[in-house]
């Protein structure tokens, strides 16, 4: 933050407290909006600013408060004008040019005094339309009005996308808002390079570059094990209302927390207290009784602005396009940031999320030959008494200290506890070809779930000079711990389901029925601990050439005690796994071809313990290992407001766990052979032309089994449900002239066909490719109010978003639907 906040004179503080504005200047006819004399004028001053887009008069006052500029303007001449958002580090003239861009307003400057004028000639500063790019974006995306970012933090420190020798997509706050992306599943469905797959037991799996992302989550850079052993596949109940952005890494993520997955990782960056007061109210209503309301407010809590707060309250209730399903979400979030000194900031936060839902899980079956039943999209084969109740509390804390201009320290911790109580039933079984009615088995389940996750991360980051060049060094350590204590039981219900004429009111059994008839289940007590130390060096070998070297040493321990039921009999199963001093290296090189283009290459090791799996002789399965290679070129234009990337990737993985066919109940595993995924990606994000924000990504993925314990599998496709071609596009265009209050958005999610191999007959169950088009139109009523209409699946494409087996797991994509939203900014 700016040190000038601590240098305000008493008179200035009084003016701020009493809102002294618009004092008349004799002979000029101009209003003095705000005069700050916090520090004497120094040529080419630089400030860190965070000023959202807002009425121009209000924005100029905020600029004066956050800098040492004395800004004079006529309020009447600014009526109806809106500023460009500022976010990041700016020199004084850069901030003025960016804020006034596109308004037709000019200014004159005399030392520390700025006089804002209307159209003029002579010495007045003429602002060309290209001056919108006169300032760089910061890492924070809120208020930037952009689909890209000036920096990512999923690695340590803050670096631009062009400086990062791996593939990272940032889903900015504007992107989340424009597309109404409120859950982690919705975000990942719109992220380039990510395939989303519905789990029959709820939640979704996420795939990147042919492999599943599992447990690789960070909160503000702190690693947690959420998702690695989570009941809801890779997703979890977390609303996007509390986050500034979501950073998605594709490729091996071992440097994030050691036991890195093959596919990638996700970093959730939460909203912070703002430097200026701002409140946003939003209401929306959509198809299938989808209602949502949100209040988001924040700002300084004391006169000097050294204490800043943020509060978000959200409630949503909705039905779904299928029978039975419903859901209610309540989210409460609070954050405080304390500037303990000009160089030290303490941040605290708390989030509470409550979900009460009637889910429709299990998906739909198919005919016994794998062909489509062509059921109505509204079909749900579950019972009306299905219930999921989830509560999640998350605590955040971090401390940032700036030692000097070059070196800084960050210490952060996160604690999260999630409890879930679930009871549900769904059918399992293929439909005989030609049947007019079915007598399909219904599986019922109860699940009591309690998971606690702890994460800690601390590092120092800085620059140093050596051999005539400036280099960067990061040294740190982190730890994560997860404790899962749950009980589940799965049993066949006495009643059957007619898939072709479903009954949603099959009697609900009591808990004793599940305990007496469980085909599988039992109590599970799981502990996972992981510790590690890491270092990353960015060495400038020459002006265009940077070598990035990283290494992490990890210690990992897992301990699971459980009772596994199979056909009414319980077996005690205890698994333990320990890995000590495991080294995960990373290497990358960047070569600046010119000011806009950088070529890069990177290598990452893959290491994932598999202590939860036992061999037939009772020993622990050895870890999954592999390597990830990436070669590409990145571009950055218009001072970072447009980013692009093209890369080739190859990932090799071996020894992943798979069921041992010698164990009838699938209770033991073997290490599989070797698999390969390779392909290429292309992505562009940001302002491609004036007033057009775009995020577009294309991914080509080819997977293959190179070696397998079953020799008949050599050479077949690995993860056949990952499409060969994947396209994600969304753009938002602001009209000009008489229609300058209107914005139009459009996009498409498209992919080629995929398939699953039947576990029964061995035949392929094919899923057709599809393209789903979405759109948006927005209108800004005035400086406070705006409305928007979003339409999803505009052409009402009928398709399966997930292909399962003959018995279950086939899910329709959402039919055409609309959401109308109204927002007010104060």
Swiss-Prot record:
Gene Ontology CC terms: cell outer membrane
Q: From the record, which residues define motif TonB box?
A: 110-119
User: TBDR beta-barrel domain: which residues?
Assistant: 276-826
Q: Alphabetically list the UniProt keywords.
A: Cell outer membrane, Ion transport, Iron, Iron transport, Membrane, Receptor, Signal, TonB box, Transmembrane, Transmembrane beta strand, Transport
Q: Which residues form the signal peptide?
A: 1-44
The motif TonB C-terminal box: which residues?
809-826
Q: Does the keyword Transport apply?
A: yes
* Membrane topology listed for this record: Multi-pass membrane protein
CDD domains in alphabetical order: ligand_gated_channel (cd01347)
Q: Tell me which InterPro entries the record gives.
A: Plug_dom, Plug_dom_sf, Secretin/TonB_short_N, TonB-dep_rcpt-like, TonB-dep_rcpt_b-brl, TonB_rcpt_b-brl_sf, TonB_rcpt_CS, TonB_sidphr_rcpt
Gene Ontology MF term list: siderophore uptake transmembrane transporter activity; signaling receptor activity
Q: What Gene3D superfamilies is this protein classified in?
A: 3.55.50.30, TonB-dependent receptor, beta-barrel domain, TonB-dependent receptor, plug domain
Q: Where is the TBDR plug domain?
A: 160-271
Kindly list the places in or outside the cell where this protein is found, as annotated in its UniProt entry. Cell outer membrane
Q: Which family does it belong to?
A: Belongs to the TonB-dependent receptor family.
- Function, in words: Specific receptor for the siderophore ferric pyoverdine (pseudobactin) M114.
Q: What is this protein called?
A: Ferric-pyoverdine M114 receptor PbuA
| Organism per entry | Pseudomonas sp. (strain M114)
Lineage of the native species? Bacteria, Pseudomonadati, Pseudomonadota
């Amino acid at each position: 933050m700016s040190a000038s906040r601590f240098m305000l004179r008493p008179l200035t503080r009084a003016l701020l407290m009493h809102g002294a504005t618009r004092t008349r200047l004799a002979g000029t006819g101009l209003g003095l909006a705000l005069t700050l004399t916090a520090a004497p004028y120094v040529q080419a001053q630089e400030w860190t600013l965070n000023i959202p887009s807002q009425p121009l008069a209000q924005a100029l006052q905020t600029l004066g408060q956050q800098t040492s500029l004395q800004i004079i303007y006529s309020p009447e001449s600014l009526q109806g004008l809106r500023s460009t958002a500022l976010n990041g580090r700016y020199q004084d003239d850069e901030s003025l040019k960016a804020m006034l861009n596109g308004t037709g307003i000019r200014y004159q400057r005399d030392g520390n005094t700025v006089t804002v004028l209307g159209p003029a000639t002579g010495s007045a500063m003429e602002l060309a339309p290209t001056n919108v790019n006169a300032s760089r974006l910061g890492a924070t995306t809120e208020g930037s009005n952009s689909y890209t970012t000036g920096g990512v933090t999923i690695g340590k420190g803050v670096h631009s996308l062009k400086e990062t020798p791996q593939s990272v997509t940032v889903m900015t706050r504007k992107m989340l808002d424009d597309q109404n992306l409120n859950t982690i599943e919705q975000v990942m469905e719109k992220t380039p390079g990510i395939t989303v797959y519905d789990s029959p037991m709820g939640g979704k799996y996420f795939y990147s570059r042919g492999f599943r992302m599992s447990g690789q989550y960070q909160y503000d850079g702190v690693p947690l094990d959420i998702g690695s052993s989570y009941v809801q596949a890779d997703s979890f109940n977390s609303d996007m209302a509390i986050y500034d952005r979501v950073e998605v890494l594709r490729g091996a993520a071992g440097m994030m927390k050691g036991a890195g997955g093959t596919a990638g990782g996700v970093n959730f960056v939460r909203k912070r207290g703002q430097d200026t007061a701002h409140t946003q109210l939003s209401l929306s209503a959509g198809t299938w009784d989808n209602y949502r309301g949100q209040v988001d407010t924040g700002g300084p809590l004391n006169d000097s602005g050294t204490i800043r707060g943020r509060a978000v309250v959200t409630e949503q209730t909705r039905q779904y396009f299928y029978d039975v399903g419903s859901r209610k979400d309540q989210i409460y979030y609070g954050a405080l940031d304390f500037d303990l000194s000009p160089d030290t900031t303490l941040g605290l936060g708390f989030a509470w999320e409550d979900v009460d839902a009637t889910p429709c899980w299990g998906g739909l079956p198919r005919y016994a030959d794998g062909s489509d039943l062509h059921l109505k999209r509204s079909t749900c084969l579950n019972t009306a008494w299905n219930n999921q109740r989830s509560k999640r509390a998350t605590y955040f804390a971090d401390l940032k200290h700036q030692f000097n201009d070059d070196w800084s320290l960050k210490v952060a911790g996160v604690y999260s506890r999630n409890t879930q109580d679930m009871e549900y039933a769904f059918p399992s079984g293929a439909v005989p070809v030609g049947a007019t009615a079915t007598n399909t088995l219904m599986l019922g389940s109860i699940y009591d779930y309690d998971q606690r996750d702890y994460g800690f991360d601390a590092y120092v980051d800085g620059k140093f000079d050596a051999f005539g060049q400036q280099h960067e060094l990061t040294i740190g350590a982190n730890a994560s711990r997860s404790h899962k204590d749950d009980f589940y039981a799965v049993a066949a219900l006495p009643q059957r389901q007619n898939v072709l004429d479903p009954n949603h009111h099959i009697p609900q059994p009591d808990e004793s029925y599940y305990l007496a008839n469980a085909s599988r289940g039992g109590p599970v007590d799981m502990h996972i601990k992981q510790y590690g130390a890491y270092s990353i060096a960015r060495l400038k070998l020459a002006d265009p050439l940077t070598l990035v070297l990283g290494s992490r040493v990890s210690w990992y321990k897992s301990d699971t005690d459980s009772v596994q039921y199979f056909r009414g009999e319980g077996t005690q199963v205890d698994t333990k796994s320990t890995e000590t001093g495991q080294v995960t290296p990373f290497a990358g090189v960047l070569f600046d071809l010119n000011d806009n283009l950088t070529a890069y290459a990177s290598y990452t090791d893959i290491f994932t313990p598999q202590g939860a799996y036992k061999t037939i002789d009772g020993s622990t399965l050895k870890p999954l290992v592999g390597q990830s290679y990436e070669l590409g070129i990145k571009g950055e234009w218009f001072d970072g407001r447009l980013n692009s990337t093209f890369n080739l990737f190859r990932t090799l993985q071996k020894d992943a766990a798979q069921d041992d066919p010698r164990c009838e109940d699938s209770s033991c595993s073997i290490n599989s052979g070797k698999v390969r995924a390779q392909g290429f990606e292309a992505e562009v994000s940001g302002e491609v032309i004036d007033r057009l924000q775009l995020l577009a990504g294309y991914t080509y993925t080819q997977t293959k089994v190179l070696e397998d314990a079953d020799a008949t599998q050599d050479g077949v496709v690995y993860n056949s449900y990952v499409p060969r071609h994947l396209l994600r596009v969304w753009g938002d265009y602001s009209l000009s002239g008489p229609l300058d209050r209107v914005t139009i958005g459009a996009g498409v999610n498209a992919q080629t066909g995929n398939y699953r191999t039947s576990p029964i007959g061995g035949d392929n169950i094919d899923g057709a490719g599809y393209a789903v088009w979405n759109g948006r139109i927005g209108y800004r009523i005035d400086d406070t109010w705006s409305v928007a209409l979003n339409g999803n699946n505009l052409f009402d494409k009928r398709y399966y978003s997930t292909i399962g087996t003959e018995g279950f797991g086939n899910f329709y994509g959402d039919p055409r639907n609309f959401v109308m939203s109204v927002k007010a900014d104060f």
